[in-house]
């Protein structure tokens, strides 16, 4: 828990690389339960997505994808978060906003999220709002 508090302090000071190092230390611990790994990976990925958007900086996409890959597919409770994060990183990877409409992989990911009964309505609503924004620009 203290490392997670340190991570937040580093993020508040814009010390993102230090935060990533601490996340990697936590996530590489051998004795952690897969649920705990998933929760920490999700938290880290969302924080890095936020940083990428806030600072218009895509340098952390590979780290985000690494964190996403640590979310166990057998943990149904986290599939909505995992799919939303995949969707968000796909958007961050676009060359420009107008290429959204022509990206079949991204549109397919959107459809899978919206049609998946195991994904919460909250996540679906967030993804739907983002989708509508990109469709109408």
Where are these regions (language model features)?
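Soluble extracytoplasmic domains of inner/organellar membrane proteins
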Residues: 13-14, 22-137
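Non-membrane alpha-helical segments in proteins
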Residues: 1-9, 42-47
């Amino acid at each position: 828990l203290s490392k997670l508090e340190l991570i937040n302090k580093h993020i508040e000071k814009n010390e993102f690389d230090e935060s990533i190092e601490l996340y990697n230390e936590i996530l590489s611990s051998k004795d952690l339960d897969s649920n705990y790994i998933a929760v920490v990976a999700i938290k880290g990925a969302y924080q890095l997505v936020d940083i990428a958007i806030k600072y218009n900086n895509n340098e952390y996409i590979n780290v985000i994808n690494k964190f996403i890959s640590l979310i166990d597919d057998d943990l149904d409770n986290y599939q909505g978060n995992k799919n939303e994060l995949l969707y968000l990183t796909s958007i961050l990877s676009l060359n420009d906003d107008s290429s959204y409409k022509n990206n079949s992989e991204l549109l397919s990911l959107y459809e899978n999220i919206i049609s998946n009964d195991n994904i919460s309505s909250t996540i679906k609503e967030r993804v739907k709002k983002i989708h509508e924004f990109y469709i109408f620009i």
